[in-house]
């Protein structure tokens, strides 16, 4: 455990040093030498964000996808007063439809072979942020941050090759306690707790996971608003496929109601970019619950950026 946190600190220090080095690259007068400088440091950063590096050197693994999407456009804003949302006293403050979206997500193993062979206990953390980077009138605030710590027990079936779901063998089963909140106070505070179950099936380049959950009672969302599951759903279905150097994935949530059906759809495509250490990343999302502040507000969003570390 100590080694894992030490590794995380070392990783952050290392990435910061690379950032300073890349800034120095911009001072090189020769275009060819300047490009070579950028390439060398981007390759090093990619290595340090690579899944094997996380696992073998730092004891940390990517959990969900890690990405930065500088161009993220959504079609409509929610009903919150921008002055309240940004804690601003200015009368002409508004929410921009164009913003930056980013997500960091990692998993830190704590114990292995604790109860059964090939089982593990780990801590995971995911943070998704929506930054009004281009909103000068509001001083470029973060519109929303969603914090999601998770404690996971997982049983891996590393030798199982028997097809169960669409000829895909069961590779793991997990039970986790998940807390999700936006870290705000007073009327903008939103958060909920769930007991989650996750079955993951995989073969070759295809991965499918089914994650239903039980919502804990008396959380901030259910206390303040009724029928939360109408918007956030009861499960999440993830599908990922790797083709050559391209990654395709989808995430679906739904309330499974014929009357008043609501849900969420997310489609992702990661593609290689020549001479750049990261993959390009396109994301389209539609529906409810992309963030807690928007969980009752239907949003359509198209984003473009880079993938730092993927689910595979």
State where each predicted segment sits:
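N-terminal signal peptide c-region/cleavage motif recognized by signal peptidases
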Residues: 14-17
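Outer-membrane beta-barrel initiation region
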Residues: 35-141, 145-149, 159
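Residue-level detector of the transmembrane beta-barrel scaffold of outer-membrane proteins
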Residues: 61-74, 120-124, 172-176, 207-211, ...
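Alpha-helical, heptad-rich or low-complexity scaffold/stalk segments
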Residues: 19-43
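Outer-membrane pore/translocation modules
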Residues: 81-89, 111-242, 252-254, 288, ...
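Outer-membrane beta-barrel "beta-signal"
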Residues: 148, 299-312
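Long, repeat-rich segments with strong aromatic
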Residues: 234-288, 310
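Sec-dependent signal peptide recognition
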Residues: 2-10
């Amino acid at each position: 455990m100590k080694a894992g946190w030490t590794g995380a600190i070392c990783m952050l220090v290392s990435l910061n040093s690379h950032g300073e080095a890349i800034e120095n690259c911009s001072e090189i007068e020769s275009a060819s030498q300047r490009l070579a400088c950028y390439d060398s440091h981007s390759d090093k950063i990619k290595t340090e964000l690579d899944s094997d590096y996380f696992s073998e050197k730092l004891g940390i693994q990517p959990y969900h996808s890690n990405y930065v999407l500088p161009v993220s456009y959504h079609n409509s804003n929610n009903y919150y007063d921008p002055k309240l949302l940004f804690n601003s006293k200015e009368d002409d403050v508004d929410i921009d439809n164009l913003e930056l979206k980013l997500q960091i997500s990692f998993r830190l193993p704590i114990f292995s072979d604790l109860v059964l062979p090939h089982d593990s206990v780990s801590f995971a953390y995911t943070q998704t942020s929506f930054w009004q980077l281009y909103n000068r009138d509001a001083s470029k605030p973060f519109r929303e941050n969603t914090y999601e710590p998770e404690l996971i027990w997982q049983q891996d079936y590393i030798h199982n090759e028997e097809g169960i779901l669409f000829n895909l063998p069961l590779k793991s089963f997990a039970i986790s306690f998940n807390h999700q909140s936006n870290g705000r106070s007073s009327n903008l505070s939103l958060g909920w707790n769930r007991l989650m179950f996750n079955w993951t099936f995989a073969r070759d380049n295809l991965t499918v996971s089914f994650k239903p959950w039980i919502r804990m009672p008396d959380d901030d969302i259910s206390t303040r608003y009724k029928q939360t599951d109408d918007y956030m759903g009861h499960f999440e279905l993830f599908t990922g496929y790797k083709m050559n150097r391209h990654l395709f994935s989808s995430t679906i949530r739904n309330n499974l109601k014929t009357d008043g059906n609501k849900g969420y759809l997310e489609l992702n495509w990661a593609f290689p970019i020549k001479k750049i250490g990261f993959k390009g990343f396109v994301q389209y999302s539609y529906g409810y619950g992309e963030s807690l502040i928007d969980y009752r507000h239907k949003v359509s969003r198209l984003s473009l950026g880079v993938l730092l570390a993927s689910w595979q």
